[in-house]
Amino acid sequence: MKKMITFYLKQISPILVIGLAIVLGLNLVGVTMNMLEGPDLLFRAIRGTTVMSLLLILITTWKITKLDSSKENITLVSLSRYAEVTKFFGKLFAAYIAAVTVIITQSAFIWYYGFTTDRIATGDVWSFIAGLGMMFLFIFMFVCYFVIPVSWLKDHVKASYVQKAGVIILLFGILIFNLLAEYYLHIYNSAGVISILPDGNFEISLLSIVWNMTLCAIIAGSYIYHKSKKSDTI
């Protein structure tokens, strides 16, 4: 498993290194301007680099998890004896490692800004831990709601325009399904709320976490089962 995770990380290392260098460079510019002009410019820099960090996480997750998922992106791992479930979680863990690297880099500057402006206290570390856990869930949701459907379509649909239409239909289908669940079950407005920002402005209900984890587990389980049956047939 360790060798497989390392292999997948090496496949996206150029993108990850370049992205981190850009984020780090812009944040350092913000810190320098903070010393010269005040915290307002640092806040602008951090706001921009936070968006860039989220995009970098999505890109690296997409690049890793799409490997060995369809005929178009087979690697040496597909020629190994790894089971499909091992490959799936190997890619997921590799995506998590890349995401944690980005998050820690960006969070260092966020906390620096928060401490220098007294907007974040030491006791707010729980929000950081909760936010990190939620980022893991968001990555899992991104893989299950987007990467897996796209990979499935690429294996079963040849025409590119049909693939694109299929992706849009699937995404809308998942969105509508979740909206219906919210309408009838109130999963996103139920009791038991976790705040992942120090000021409490971004809160998520426990029921919505359980709902999305269950839905993702069903999608991932079906995908792994299908890939395993296909491998056994071959």
Identify the function of each model-found stretch.
Residues 1-73, 84-234:
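Hydrophobic alpha-helical transmembrane segments of membrane proteins
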Residues 78-84:
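Short helix-to-coil transition segments within interhelical loops
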